[in-house]
């Protein structure tokens, strides 16, 4: 299996270095490894068989990986397989007053450490507020800049029917937004302005 990066799914305005698209490709690869094991196949992953793309260019059309499947009865299955269809993005409000303990954080980062990656936790209230401020500022820039907002608007999925039909994109499950859209009171392509109802929503 040769996995290539779909040029039609690139986001040059909001993902200019292809970080998100490559994360998505990586997720597919890992799912393929897990599913292959479930079916009794060992999946060998050969990353970037034609060479890694230029870091300053979007990876459209690039071969991201070659997957070689070999029947292997000794391949161990992964308990995560049964959870794949249950995965979803948690968009609930998080309680930032709760602090993750050192032992909890250690167990969360253990898989990353196995691959030589490092991670850290932001638990101090002052540091949390700094991260929030950066996030708010970044969000405002993306929402109030026409070229970045409109790129995202084309990927908005409003209400249950759109979210079910299109399994990609930016889902907006809010009942209020769905109702306003149904009655023609919410235009996803209207560029928000600071203080406007669209920006507030």
Describe the predicted segments one by one.
Residues 1-201:
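Acidic, surface-exposed loops and disordered segments
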């Amino acid at each position: 299996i040769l996995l290539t990066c779909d040029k039609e799914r690139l986001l040059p305005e909001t993902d200019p270095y292809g970080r998100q698209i490559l994360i998505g490709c990586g997720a597919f690869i890992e799912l393929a490894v897990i599913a292959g094991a479930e079916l009794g196949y060992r999946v060998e992953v050969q990353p970037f068989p034609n060479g890694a793309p230029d870091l300053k260019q979007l990876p459209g059309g690039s071969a991201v990986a070659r997957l070689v499947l070999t029947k292997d009865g000794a391949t161990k299955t992964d308990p995560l397989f049964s959870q794949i269809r249950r995965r979803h993005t948690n968009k609930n409000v998080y309680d930032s007053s709760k602090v993750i303990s050192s032992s909890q954080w250690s167990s969360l980062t253990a898989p990353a450490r196995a691959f030589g990656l490092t991670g850290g936790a932001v638990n101090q209230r002052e540091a949390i507020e700094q991260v929030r401020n950066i996030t708010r500022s970044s969000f405002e820039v993306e929402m109030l800049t026409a070229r970045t907002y409109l790129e995202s608007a084309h990927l908005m999925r409003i209400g249950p029917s759109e979210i079910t039909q299109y399994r990609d994109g930016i889902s907006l499950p809010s009942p209020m937004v769905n109702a306003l859209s149904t009655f023609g009171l919410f235009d996803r392509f209207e560029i928000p302005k600071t203080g406007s109802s669209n920006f507030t929503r």
